[in-house]
Amino acid sequence: MGIFDELNLPAGVLYGDDVLKLFQYAREKQFAIPACNVTSSSTAVAALEAARDQKAPIILQTSQGGAAFFAGKGIKDSAEKREASVAGAIAAAHYIRSIAPIYGIPVVLHTDHCAKKLLPWLDGMLEEDEKFFKANGVPLFSSHMIDLSEEPVEENISTCVKYLKRMAPMKQWLEMEIGITGGEEDGVDNSEVDNASLYTQPEDIWQIEEAFRPISPYFSIAAGFGNVHGVYAPGNVKLHPELLGKHQAYVSEKLGGKDKKPVFFVFHGGSGSSKEEYREAISNGVVKVNVDTDLQWSYLVGIRDYILNNIDYLRSQVGNPEGPNKPNKKKYDPRVWIREGEKTMKARVEEALKDFNAAGTV
């Protein structure tokens, strides 16, 4: 028995109550779903293929920078309208929606880290969501993430409330962040923040729950428990996933104590974390774990090794160790070397699915 049997979910991109059911099931069964940042059709299919082969759900997400890359680096992305990142995110969404069903797994289609300066990007996507919802009864994206963790708590919550009210009629999921994740990722740089800012307080979690619950049940919280974006050796990041358990207990008591884990938590900045740290966080209600930095590296590894191993076939179009007139087209065809990156990225996603207990849940 698994997700399809117990929850009656479709293959392909999920929306609304199906997303809620998936996260409830993950929290109950103590697994988390990797959220893979994708920047192209190639990175998207690598993650989908990994999830298919591991019989697991997957979350595919685009950051603002990743979405702009999807549209093309030659397109202007103005601060006022974010034309390229809006168009790129929409293009990625339609592409993923089109191919996800043939992989036979549940997929959540998400956008990542929308800071205050990037809200025009979110506005543009929500306009498209509303048009799509009017025509199809579901939004284009399953969910969006707003990251106002650098702003005052009151501003963070009130802004998210405004957007949640807009998203609620579409039953669209909102992920928000409270407590700063250190380090730097995709233009959001918190590498110089005070360490105390890396730990969210239980009162903040309750303030969010109290504000959001009357509007919609479709939300999750990326809380800070020492998380840091970027690349760090194991042991160099001091995580305290036990704090998430204390947050759950605090909110549970406020709600009457019936539900012992009422909060959906998200784990950001996990590079260098141990399997034990991941699993402790998952046991405390983490249902989504962001995976970006490691996937960038893993994708490169396959391409790098292919080039190094075939360098004598890649110096010219004609001529190689087999003869001066031998063609090299089969070696430099992009479908060959890009596929090598997909293979190594796929392997890293499969590792994450196993580490987060998600493998075999479909």
From Swiss-Prot:
D-glyceraldehyde 3-phosphate binds at residue 63. The keyword Mitochondrion does not apply. Pathway: Carbohydrate degradation; glycolysis; D-glyceraldehyde 3-phosphate and glycerone phosphate from D-glucose: step 4/4. InterPro entries: Aldolase_TIM, FBA_II, Fruct_bisP_bact. Zn(2+) 2 binds at residues 147, 177. GO terms for molecular function: fructose-bisphosphate aldolase activity; melatonin binding; zinc ion binding. Dihydroxyacetone phosphate binds at residues 230, 269-271, 290-293. GO terms for biological process: canonical glycolysis; gluconeogenesis; glycolytic process. GO terms for cellular component: cytosol; mitochondrion. Binds 2 Zn(2+) ions per subunit. One is catalytic and the other provides a structural contribution. The active site is at residue 112. Its EC number is 4.1.2.13. The keyword Nucleotidyltransferase does not apply. It is an enzyme of class 4 (lyase). It catalyses: beta-D-fructose 1,6-bisphosphate = D-glyceraldehyde 3-phosphate + dihydroxyacetone phosphate. CDD domains: FBP_aldolase_IIA. Catalyzes the aldol condensation of dihydroxyacetone phosphate (DHAP or glycerone-phosphate) with glyceraldehyde 3-phosphate (G3P) to form fructose 1,6-bisphosphate (FBP) in gluconeogenesis and the reverse reaction in glycolysis. This is Fructose-bisphosphate aldolase. The lineage of its organism: Eukaryota, Fungi, Dikarya, Ascomycota, Pezizomycotina. The gene is fba.
